[in-house]
């Protein structure tokens, strides 16, 4: 089964979105 570009993109989004929110939250809390 070949890996699609779409699947890679979705996997990246799924990994990056929570990380982005965690980073934003961390900056808000450290004020």
Curated annotation (Swiss-Prot):
Signal peptide: none annotated. The keyword Chloroplast applies. It is found in: Plastid, Chloroplast thylakoid membrane. The chain crosses the membrane at residues 7-26. Its main location: plastid. NCBIfam families: PS_I_psaM. Belongs to the PsaM family. This is Photosystem I reaction center subunit XII.
